[in-house]
Amino acid sequence: MSNEDFILNAEARDVSGKGASRRLRREAGLVPAIVYGGRKNPQNVTITLRELTKHLENEAFYSHIITLNIGDSSEQVILKDLQRHPATNFAMHADFLRVSKTKKFNTKVPLHFINEATSKGVKEQGGKVQHSMTELEIACLPADLPEFIEVDLANVELGGIVHISDIVLPKGVESIALQQGEDHDLPVASIFKPKGVAGDEDEEAEGDAE
């Protein structure tokens, strides 16, 4: 887990709708957002674009418990969804999910692939790594939320495939996919032989022909 603390300051907003949201972004430099979940009603809020953009530059922000200050109150939330402008990539709208210390919740965390260049399939056998996933949906308590999950490729050989079930998950963390059965044990990464690269058998055949 990350030791960083993320704090966002927000203000409640009464006006909703596309027109109002556009005015907020254009005239006030604010990003409309919604906070939902738990036993409370959804709440519309605004966050300054500058403050939100600063946090979005940190990968840990996407998979971390955030303290969201709304006026005189505060909520423990996670970033559940983010809409960006297709041209500028600026944040246009954010969804925050309330979390409880005693209840598990679902979220996605990034996968960090380690030992790619030194894996058997790459270093010794000339293969290349292909990522089938870059994040994994998990369930856990807020205290167990990891910043990321490592996928170790050190012992993966050419032609080898790493599935979700091969990942060593942190304590208290469960895979949503694996909860749904073996059919959902999808590939995460594999090592393949690039096209145009001759294998050992081809080289031996050429040697025999000479």
UniProtKB/Swiss-Prot annotation:
Name one cellular component (GO) term.
cytosolic large ribosomal subunit
Summary of the function given for this chain in its UniProt record: This is one of the proteins that binds to the 5S RNA in the ribosome where it forms part of the central protuberance.
Q: What is this protein called?
A: Large ribosomal subunit protein bL25
A Pfam family assignment: Ribosomal_TL5_C
Q: Which Gene3D superfamilies match?
A: Ribosomal protein L25, beta domain (2.170.120.20), Ribosomal Protein L25, Chain P (2.40.240.10)
The biological processes this protein is annotated with in GO are: translation
Record bears the keyword Lipoprotein: no
To which species is this protein native?
A: Saccharophagus degradans (strain 2-40 / ATCC 43961 / DSM 17024)
Acetylation in keyword set? no
Coiled-coil region: none
Subunit (UniProt):
Part of the 50S ribosomal subunit; part of the 5S rRNA/L5/L18/L25 subcomplex. Contacts the 5S rRNA. Binds to the 5S rRNA independently of L5 and L18.
Q: Any idea which UniProt keywords this protein has?
A: Ribonucleoprotein, Ribosomal protein, RNA-binding, rRNA-binding
The UniProt similarity line reads:
Belongs to the bacterial ribosomal protein bL25 family. CTC subfamily.
Record-level Gene Ontology MF annotations = 5S rRNA binding; structural constituent of ribosome
* InterPro entries in the cross-refs: Rbsml_bL25/Gln-tRNA_synth_N, Ribosomal_bL25/Gln-tRNA_synth, Ribosomal_bL25_b-dom, Ribosomal_bL25_C, Ribosomal_bL25_long, Ribosomal_L25_dom, Ribosomal_uL5_bac-type
Give the signal peptide range.
none
